[in-house]
Amino acid sequence: MRYLATLLLSLAVLITAGCGWHLRDTTQVPSTMKVMILDSGDPNGPLSRAVRNQLRLNGVELLDKETTRKDVPSLRLGKVSIAKDTASVFRNGQTAEYQMIMTVNATVLIPGRDIYPISAKVFRSFFDNPQMALAKDNEQDMIVKEMYDRAAEQLIRKLPSIRAADIRSDEEQTSTTTDTLATPARVSTTLGN
């Protein structure tokens, strides 16, 4: 019985390791982005902390913004906006439920290449109980913190697509340069008198 349990456990480990299964909330960050500079207007703000945490969870080494290295990709965090819309109302017309929408803009600068804009949008809703103002504020703070974490996860998940776009632009550049080199010069075939 013990032998069978060991065999089944070993088989389960081999199957999950062999099929490319990964732990939840981890992303295959491209090898060219394993060392990065995180640039933010608010380096100790909630979004910067969430992105820094996600980058470290995904094995990315972060360099100081003032580093002298110019060959390292840079993730620049931009504007964050949080909008709050009414989702439902009570019979008396007061708001019963809000939907919050967080939009985060960022850019990835790959030295010698291009600047790639990325963005993330996170939606959450919460109930507005007017009789529990303090609890409502605490719940809203927790929801906003969770939204920052989800936005950071979305931004990190978009890094592999940036690498793919970078490779695609390289291929397009090489194909256009080879096309212009391979095109023969125009030769006139008219006979003059």
UniProtKB/Swiss-Prot annotation:
InterPro entries: LPS_assembly_LptE. Coiled coil: none annotated. Pfam families: LptE. GO terms for biological process: Gram-negative-bacterium-type cell outer membrane assembly; lipopolysaccharide transport. One of its GO terms (molecular function) is lipopolysaccharide binding. Residues 167-193 are annotated as: Disordered. Residues 1-18 form the signal peptide. A lipid is attached at residue 19 (N-palmitoyl cysteine). The keyword Membrane applies. Keywords: Cell outer membrane, Lipoprotein, Membrane, Palmitate, Signal. It is found in: Cell outer membrane. It comes from the Bacteria. One of its GO terms (cellular component) is cell outer membrane. The keyword GTP-binding does not apply. Together with LptD, is involved in the assembly of lipopolysaccharide (LPS) at the surface of the outer membrane. Required for the proper assembly of LptD. Binds LPS and may serve as the LPS recognition site at the outer membrane. Component of the lipopolysaccharide transport and assembly complex. Interacts with LptD. Belongs to the LptE lipoprotein family. HAMAP family: LPS_assembly_LptE. This is LPS-assembly lipoprotein LptE. The lineage of its organism: Bacteria, Pseudomonadati, Pseudomonadota, Gammaproteobacteria, Enterobacterales.
